[in-house]
Amino acid sequence: KRYLIFLIFFVPLFYKSDSLEKFLISFQWKPFNVVETKDSIYGKITVLKNEDAVDFYENSSKVYSTVLSAKNEEITHLPLFLSYDCKNILLLGGGLHNIREILKYPVKKIVYVEQNPVLVELLKKHSDDRIMSLWENPIVKVISTDGRFFIKRTTDIYDCVILDVSPPLTGLANRYFTKE
């Protein structure tokens, strides 16, 4: 009965208000500091800050962090080391740390395809100076479109394609691992 009284009096205060949503989101992400949330057609993107790191989550799954991980080095260095004289690189997903690792090689062009334009917008907005320089690098081209769609439509030839997407556990992710 107390909860019903609470609902009757307090829910109308939050009706059509962002404050209830902000409260619920900050409660969901405790103890992290929620910097921003934004909806896209691919899901809700949440930007969290914890100490020196800024982390980006899409539908509650971490998709990018401003802290470099060993995963970024593994994903980029292995194919570039095994390939000979790669000048034109296509990077599907994975974020800016992969670009930073690729730039350690004498490449001429990096095309970074990120499906979610809202994620790209938030990455640019919440990047520090070190990361921001990657966005402004003249050999880096960022394209916001579906990676598989891009591969089917491009006429460019790439010396190396680096795929940094989710494992093929869902139909959406499996598209990158099939011929159909």
Over which residues does each language-model region extend?
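Basic, ligand-binding patches in group-transfer machinery
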Residues: 2-63, 69
